[in-house]
Amino acid sequence: MKSQNSKEQKSDFSYKETLNLLKTDFSMRANSVLREPEIQNFWANNDIDFQLGSSNSGEIFTLHDGPPYANGALHMGHALNKVLKDIINKYKTLKGFRVHFVPGWDCHGLPIELKVLQNLKSDERKNLDTLNLRKKATDYAHIQINNQKEGFKRWGIWGDWNNPYLTLKKSYESAQIGVFGKMFLNGYIYRGLKPVHWSPSSRTALAEAELEYPDDHYSKSIYVSLKITKIPEEIQLNFIQKNINIKKDFFQNNSFITIWTTTPWTIPANEAVAVNPKINYIFAIDEEKRIYLFAKDLCSEISKKFNKDFKVLLEVKGSKLENIEYQHPSKNKNCRIVIGGDYITTESGTGIVHTAPGHGIDDFNVGQKYDLPITCVVDEKGNLNEYSGQFKGSNVLKDANDLIIEYLKVNNLLLLQENYKHRYPYDWRTKKPTIFRATEQWFASVNGFRSSALKAIEDVEWMPETGKKRIYSMVVGRGDWCISRQRSWGVPIPVFYKKNGNEILLNKEIINHIQELFSEHGADIWWDWDVKNLLPENYAKESDLWKKGKDTMDVWFDSGSSWAAVCELRSELKYPADLYLEGSDQHRGWFQSSLLTSVAVNNKPPYKKVLTHGFALDENGRKMSKSLGNVVDPNIIINGGNNKKTDPAYGADVLRLWVSSVDYSVDVPIGSNILKQLSDVYRKVRNTARYLLGNIHDYDPKIDSFEIDQLPLLDQWMLGRLVEVTDQISNAYENYEFSKFFQILQSFCVVDLSNFYLDIAKDRLYVSSKSQFRRRSCQFVMSKVVENLAVLISPVLCHMAEDIWQNIPYSTKEKSVFQRGWPIFSQSWKNKILNEHISNLRNLRVEINKAIEGCRNKQIIGAALETEVNYLPEDKALKDSLTWLKEFGNQDVDLFRDWLIVSNFQVVSDLVDNSLATDNNALGKIQINKAQGQKCDRCWHYQKETFNGIQNTKLCKRCSNIINFEFI
């Protein structure tokens, strides 16, 4: 009856107003769409952004920006690239380096030129001269740059946005002419007739970096028989020695060289066929008494393909076949067998290669050796010209192949036609096939400085290391670099040609003069001014003899000159740059073009370190494309989509967190599920920071600061853990291992703080007297944690970090988190013995919590404070740790009971009966019992001794004293 009566008299009075509850303006919800731009304005108005790094007193750190193309909307590839760079720059700024990040844009080239033309009506296109085209291209590029720039800034990227480098700027074009000029004067640039990758769809030559190689291209491959007209006496003697009696007339009328090609349209350009001198070839006769020449190792495959049974008449080394003559397949002339190289194999075909020196690099090289004609049968549109004879007017990408195949068939020269799937070069812009076509072009002779370039590669640190092997093999095997383009929107090659003849005018005086003119007036004057005004004064009298060249430079030469136009010219930067950071495709692009120009001019690489990242894919590992509907838009990640339920606004920091979470050295996935997971992590970090800020609202570090040995053991451990985490995160940033930062941050916020230190701290913070040491010491530690947590996350979660800093409730010397500098702690804060003991005790805490949670799940108890724990130790190290805690711990903070958040804990030698739960494990025996005594209505601890409180409430002795001294 008494117990029931006491329940009926239970008071509804709450001691909430007597507790030290959270107070902070740092909201639980980030509201990033509004708050992040406010923070960015704060940075801009207070010179916190890139100006901060520029004003540092340390060593210059230069991360040179590879220029994105000034066309189109920003995508996830941009986000991955620019955020990685920004993380590094912000970290270096905090470390005291002088960081001046100059963003850049690649502005010339065909895509912009085509965009301009597409936006014009037909009549406007016809009447458009070069200068107007260039003006429209300039205007278009600036619009694209401004759009992209605003996007980058919204991502929190710091940079010299008011003075970026643009490849269309006068100063840049002038510096680029300087690079070209020095390479020319060093003997590395020449003009010559040579097969180059030619895009009929773009009507210009292409560099290797402008090509794509899809795996699913099908070519019309053909096997062709070429009638032998003359055979050397040595081979005739071989037949005689083998007792093969074949009359000369019969042999010449019935013997054929067998070739295979995947480009039938080049047949009219044939000038020879090539064999490998090391391969064994056979003359084989079929049942129709026709003799064929092909590689011995391919006999079985050819027999199947032709559906013929062959009898081998004679085996001959390739080196012995030279000068066998045959009748050209479409022209009235004889050609011959020549000796080729290792490019001729027996992997496919016949082992004998159709050779058209005007339409292939290997063919060209063999042609040079044998002084063969360099016949080009195709014009700039891809149409066959007069040199193709009867096929003139047909197009290589349309009907030429079919016409030539039909011709060969009618003339009994076609042995077999079949589709052949292989990798084939496509124009990366138009997505259409390219061809090899011999034209007069300007080249950079890589042979002249290849060994220096390879040595420079060895001097650079490549991350990952595989990047070094990749670019090394590319430079070892690359041919001369075709740097001329037949387009209007680019930097002109500053050469003059004799009106009558092939003589060129290009020397040091002219190069320097053009460079000065471009510096003052820009490259447009090349089309605007006449020759007389472009030439130096002492050439004025002969200006009528010369005409301006029409070629522009490859855009890779544009961007590849950025070390000279940016790093070398700007005093706040340095050359070589500390770091280049781009996608892995740039080993054949910007990394390589920059390396080649820098080595050719200055005999050194333009960078000290090169870091590469993969590509952004969807969650299923597929390439993003509009057709698949799997494109992830960074703008939608930040601002949300039309349907905020399916596409919520996550803000820039979640985008940045994604970049830090992935192993960017390989291709990385992104999608809605990943974003939700990242948002959860972001929220946990934010809520951890909010809890820290909310509990130091009445803390003043000027009054309540402590030496570490004055603190309870738990607080000493927390500060030591802060030092360890800082060291780990520092190493992650230093080594560009940002995914480690992500993992360390998660573990620190969730495992060390939320689940352990802050969980235990609740009683100290809420229930203690405001100025009690157990509370102030905890606030001291929390202030250290929140200040340094803000700094540690600031390179990645820059907006949240600044938001935390602005909500620190006491005054700080620094206006911004980025002015604080990178944390430096005394290593004495780390205590190995303390760490070992607390690690043991945390392990025990985990096991006890499991047992308590089991009781809670069975609804035996509600809160853990309703229990008390008996522990029978079996682990010596753990027993020692409990003894250590009891001996050296602070009695107001370091009782293991309080670390468990139970009402009582005791080490026992025997367990009692009638427990709520018992658990036996390697650590010992754990027994969960119902807490004895009465519940304090203020702190909820169960105590055997309680006192009457307000309105029939019960208080423990501690809470009773606090209420009496502070509130009554």
UniProtKB/Swiss-Prot annotation:
Chain coiled-coil ranges: none
Enzyme class: ligase
Residue interval(s) of motif 'HIGH' region: 68-78
Protein residues bound to L-isoleucyl-5'-AMP: 582
One GO CC term on file: cytoplasm
Domain notes: IleRS has two distinct active sites: one for aminoacylation and one for editing. The misactivated valine is translocated from the active site to the editing site, which sterically excludes the correctly activated isoleucine. The single editing site contains two valyl binding pockets, one specific for each substrate (Val-AMP or Val-tRNA(Ile)).
Gene Ontology BP annotations: isoleucyl-tRNA aminoacylation
Listed Gene3D superfamilies: 1.10.730.20, HUPs, Ile-tRNA synthetase CP2 domain-like, Valyl/Leucyl/Isoleucyl-tRNA synthetase, editing domain
Subunit structure: Monomer.
Name the record gives this protein: Isoleucine--tRNA ligase
Binding site for ATP: 626
Gene name of this polypeptide: ileS
